Amino acid sequence: MANKRKPIVNWILFLATIVAVFFLGLLASSITERRAEEVTSCKPEVKIGEWEPRNEVWGKNYPSEYESYMLNDESDFATKYNGNAMIDMLEVDPRLVVLWAGYGFSKDYNQGRGHTYAISDLRNSLRTGAPVDDNTGPMPATCWTCKSPDVPRVMNEDGVKEFYTGKWARLGDDVVNPIGCADCHNNETMDLQISRPALVEAYERMGKDINKATHQEMRSLVCAQCHVEYYFDKKRPGAEGSAYLTFPWDGGMSVEAMEEYYDAIEFKDWTHKLSKAPMLKAQHPGYEVYLTGIHAERGVSCADCHMPYMSEGGKKYTDHHIQSPLNNIENSCMVCHKEKTAQLLKDVYDRQDRIIETRDKLEELIVRAHVEAKKAWDLGATEEQMKDILMDIRHSQWRWDYAAASHGGSFHSPVELGRVISTGITTAQEGRIKLARLLIELGFDGEVPYPDIETKAKAQEFIGLPVDKLKEEKQRFLKELAPEWDKKAKERESKMPIVYTNN
């Protein structure tokens, strides 16, 4: 006789089926709704022109990305050593003033803020001087290269060599939109693309084709357009008279390879005011240092950590709030690392502490070398006597600056930076030993006093910098010429139509 199923069991099965169907229906509805949201979000509102520099225009088609991009305005996050707030680094470390004596960075050097401040911070910097017209001021037009999506537009209109020619002030009314969309994206496909010729040219000289880079490589290469070491080549064949932006990678990207490149062409950024050494100023070799680290070795890109993926309404997109991963650990570090936040922070700070400790020791040695070299000159040293000493100063400070200017390098590649700093310490000490022998030969057998540079003001006074005059001139520029630039730019952009698609 067949077993009869109890009525209660039938009811349970019936109710379970209803519940299952209900939740499947919710899931299907959610998927359909999210697909609809994604389709809607991908409908372009405007047609973006090939050289469109205005980030807000791109934002009409990509509101999520643009909304996150505007978070770059924030400047209230601080880590142990860095962050996104404006910090006067010369006040934090007055020794920098002496290291850069005779160079623009001794006037003004602040910790970088978000990309949205690229134009305003450059205008406000004492390094760009106080031009009164298109043909005055200390800096070349090339200094705009990495600051704005207006740059590829102007390069297309005028030519690359022409862009690099003349004074910084010449392009003041042309370059007004801060770093943004067109710097990294194709206007039609949104694919990542290289918009600055210096990176492409550097690849060509190394025998590489940047067009063969993978998408993952491009997620770092778009950053490498600017976060690299570079110099202004004023002797480039066919571009004489310009300050042609060039990456010194022909023989490799290591600190030694770039040093050899510069030495071979006898290039110098400036002559040091105290020691008279032919100096090199490292710009920001972040990409070169990153390539020597474990994350690059594992295939992790810049964007993976500094611009991680986000999800919203069924849409996956890249967070364009470009910031320290320490302000977004969950979406950056914890995608791969499962340690607790406190442990991850400790790992980062431990590496930074150790690199900065040794970097500061090198820094003091070089300050002493500059001051001792000045003493030798004052005592009548000859150029022949000083030649090798000055090269030691040049090479040791190049290594210090390579480590100091590669922002984040103490985490990106602590092993390599530790090696670079150690060779810098050795070179600085060798130079100081030679100086000690020369000073004795010149009749001085005492210790050259270390200068009183406890504050930025004292350090700038020590090197004879007329700070008050520079600030007064800068304020005049900001009140008189800068507003004229903005007025002309507004008039020009008012004639650039925004074409709506009417979808």
Predicted regions located by residue number:
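Single-pass type I membrane protein transmembrane segment
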Residues: A16-I18
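Asp/Glu-centered strand-loop micro-motifs enriched in Gly/Pro and often flanked by an aromatic residue
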Residues: F105-G137, A141
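Extended, compositionally biased alpha-helical segments that mediate assembly or anchoring
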Residues: K488-N503
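Primarily the internal scaffold of c-type cytochrome electron-transfer domains
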Residues: K4-F14, L24-A118, N156-D304, P308-E484
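A cross-kingdom signal targeting lumenal/periplasmic-facing segments of multi-pass membrane
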Residues: D133-V154, G159
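Tryptophan-rich substrate-binding surfaces of secreted polymer-degrading and adhesive proteins
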Residues: M1
